[in-house]
């Protein structure tokens, strides 16, 4: 994947905290499958970061089709994937692997984060 530094917006974090949005975990290969589908239909190679949102939007649309629910689905396309061709190459060559950390690995990682005064840690 990408070696980019990804930061959370304080506004997005607050919207999540207040229950206006949810976070979802998506396997890397499923993300790139969605990116490929989007590129074939729209003619735009999406950035991997945007492709996570595309995957979830597709999943939501399929769920709505199956349940008959009418819903407006919006996602952000924040960039193209032309700077991340190595990741696309790994996907197409079958070299990309999904990594799903265990609860113990997550707990160990979270325990190593610095404590920030004034935040719920």
Feature-to-residue mapping (PLM):
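Short, acidic Gly/Pro/Ser/Thr-rich loop/turn segments
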Residues: 7-10, 81-83
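Catalytic phosphate/nucleotide-handling subdomain of diverse soluble enzymes
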Residues: 58-117
